Amino acid sequence: MKNSLIIILSTLLFSQTEPIENLRENSPRVWTLTNAMIHTSPGNFIKGGSISIRNGKIEAVGRYIKTPKDAFEINLNGAHVYAGFIESWLETGLNKESLKSTRKHWDSKVRPENRSVDNLDIKNKAIKELRSLGFTTAHLAPKHGIFRGQSGIINLQNEPKPIKSSVAQIIDFKYREKGKRTYPRSLLGVIAHIRQTFYDSDWYLKAQEIYAAYPSENEPLASNISLESLGMSRAVNKPFVFITTDETYSQRAINISSEFDLNPWILGSGYEYRRLDYFSKTKPFFILPIDFPSKPNVVKPMSDLQYSTAELKHWDIAPDNLFYLNNAGHDFSITSHYMKKKSEFRKNLQKIIDRGLSEDIVLSALTTQPAEALGMQKSLGKIAPGYDANLVVVDGEYFDPKSKIVSVWI
């Protein structure tokens, strides 16, 4: 992986309006990739096919398409081409400008109006790591808070480019550390705070409606952009992503979603297999990390006593989590989030496949499933005319651990 060549062909390169003065120093606007094994979508492929790209969009795909006269042709010599993968969870910092607003919620941890795309605080190293795995697009979430704000979508260029400003509201159950006197200071307090904020939002929107209908009989309502943003997100059935650390947090997320009629998504913990029956009614969309627990060190005598039966059982079952969720009929995507070593990502994908989940399902969890959930199914996740030319070129099959990524196109 370290020796693989990463090529970024941004649509920004195609947007220049100045006259071309030296052809050899200007990137071509039209490309044709020939002689490739093209994985157009999970389960579908074209052997010996070609892809024509114009201005950052796929113009044609097929086995017998003609190379446009103005195209720069590249012979891929049988390399495999996949639609660019979608990283379902990437975090960025808080937009500090939003903290200056006088119309915000009294608690700085409640910022549903905050948008992740307004503060692209992402290290270049992190972007390069994701591209080295084949990711070309990311679902970007705010990093801090209880009501963290709105996620968005970016292309993983050297200078990330937002392509959708608002996807979902993000909720975290994390409470403030002990020793701090600010509310909330316990899990019980966080849950109460989340519920009260939803009730406050309901009250705020209803009060606005009453004032609009009877302005002469009521005092004007103080503007609160936080409660308004939260209410509007619910009104348009925007997804609410709950960050979980085990199966009990997932249950809490489902309970809150049922109480307030939310469209729930769950950033998983890897323990979902323990409560499959609990998700059957609401059918949330799962964003699943694959940072499996490391092998317990039980070589030395008595060292096995430091591990509980539950820990040993989870170590054994964790790679099966996606298999169980798929068999239960749940939709999910895969994320590299939480992985300390991104180089383990493809190895862990192979573990999932070895445990029985098909390559097509795994590929769909990296492409078509997140694209559909994010509302980008007409431009991302497939290799087809009209789609963004976000591509991953591999010298063999992606799920073959010996294969190397040759280039990434964005």
Model-derived features: positions:
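Divalent metal-coordination and catalytic microenvironments
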Residues: 36, 51, 56, 78, ...
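C-terminal cap of metal-dependent C-N hydrolases
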Residues: 36-39, 47, 372, 384, ...
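His/Asp/Glu-enriched, well-ordered alpha-helical/loop segment
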Residues: 27, 98, 102-106, 111-113, ...
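Histidine-rich, glycine-flanked metal-binding segment
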Residues: 18, 23-25, 29, 38, ...
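Polyanionic/metal-chelating signatures
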Residues: 131-268
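Sec-dependent N-terminal signal peptides
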Residues: 3-13
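Active-site core of metal-dependent hydrolases
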Residues: 48, 213-316, 333, 372-374, ...
